[in-house]
Amino acid sequence: RGLGDVYKRQIYRGGAVIFRGTEKCTLRDCYIHHVGGNGVFFDKYNRNSAVTGSYLTSIGASAICFVGDVAGVRSPSFRYGEFVPLDKMDTAKGSQNDNHPAYCEVYDNLICTIGLFEKQITGVELSMCRNITVSHNSIYDTPRAGINISEGTWGGHIIEYNDIFNTVKETGDHGTINSWGRDRFWHPNYNVMTQITDENPALILADVVEPIIIRHNRLRCDRGWDIDLDDGSSNYQIYNNLCLNGGIKLREGFYRTVENNIIVNNTLHPHLWFKNSGDVFSRNIVMTKYKPIRVYGWGREVDYNIFTDSLSYLAARQLGGDAHSIVAAIRFIDAAKGDFNVADDSEAIIKGGFRNFPMNNFGVLSFHLKQLAESPVMPVPLVAGHVTDTKTMLWKGVTFKNLDTLEERSATGMDTERGVYVVSVDALGSPVRDFIAPNDVVLGINRKSVNKLSDMKEALKRADTQKEVEFIIFRNQKEHKVVIPL
């Protein structure tokens, strides 16, 4: 299903250097610059080939791409709203052919100032490929992700020891390391997808047949998430990462194990979790409250974490998890210089089970690339305090608020932070429960634009004397006109 090249975007299968049908070929110690399109493109069949020790800068599109043959994807869909009916779906595991990159490597490269012309690009693109290792790269100054995993087809990647920052500079709803799932089980309607996965659990890992590992990276995103697993991304192992600003988001999906990460000044962002997701979030250093959106179950285990303040810990306990988690005063060894390890005698290690990991091994290794490579700005660690309550509005059993957070924008698929977000609907007492649903966004009432709560209040005042009111609601990535009788 994945189709990263034709699904989320169209991609040009070309570049300054093209690998096609290669085995054991390496681009080593090269300088690729001032290229109008892609830098290096691995197209379809490639095995055990690599890009190492190179400097890629001033690139018009993506720096390095691995993109397999669409014909290898079983039961593909090509647009967001499309879905292959289950009775017509090929349910076999894995690829239909071997016409894709596999067992290739991107090692010790400096990638910066890319996406000069195209914006839906990335430093390293992985689409319809398997077992690609991306390690010891420094990637920064990008309009979108530093590393993008377009879909689950077909997993087995290892992403490690990279230094990635200054990303998502010209777009939004994205991450420094980003993934789109959208494998065969995925459906744009969450309720339909829930039914599919309940009845056909074997489909969950039919495309991502091997786990994808994200470990030992230093990541910073100031306009999104440090790690963003979107749209049902499944079968991930995420551990020993230093997340400097944006936190970790897991939307939909199954079998994500997130352990022993340091999440500076941020937290876990669980979006639309399934009741039986199999997710694990454990032994992480967490510095703010969890930010859940429409979580229907808390996975296999959300517990044994280390919170840096009691407010965040108590909020987590109220959600029903973290029974064995602790609150500990965290003193990083030298945060200003990038050492976010904690003392060996700290409570995080003695009671919380956290394990320090190396802080001096991120990014490029070659001497000449180290001399050129920049480093991220180190954050000042903050302890969370009381936050003023968000303003809400209650109308006919429906609770509304301004859509004003990145989390709400991502969960709804909105283009910007605008409109009025539906927080909850009283399933028994609301007379409009058949018309408005949680996670809807109200964009208009009676042909008047609604950008914030005050707009909505004014529009509803005028509608009080009418027999019906017309809402424009954004739901499942589309605007809908809904007429509600009063």
Model-identified regions with their sequence ranges:
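PDZ-domain C-terminal substructure recognizer with occasional recognition of PDZ-binding tails
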Residues: A437, L443, S449, D455-L486
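Acidic, glycine- and Ser/Thr-rich low-complexity intrinsically disordered tracts
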Residues: V73, G175-T176, W180-M193, N276-T399
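Right-handed parallel beta-helix
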Residues: E23-G37, N46-A61, V73-A92, Q96-G115, ...
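PDZ/PDZ-like domain segments forming the peptide/carboxylate-binding groove
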Residues: T399-G444, K448-N451
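Glycine-rich beta-solenoid repeat tracts in large extracellular/virion proteins
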Residues: G15-G21, N38-Y45, S62-G68, A92-H100, ...
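Short, small-residue-biased leader/transition segments that mark boundaries at the very start
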Residues: G2-Y7
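C-terminal, low-ordered peptide segments at domain boundaries
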Residues: A384-E417, K478-L486
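Solvent-exposed coil/turn segments that connect beta secondary-structure elements
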Residues: D69, R182, L403, V425-A427, ...
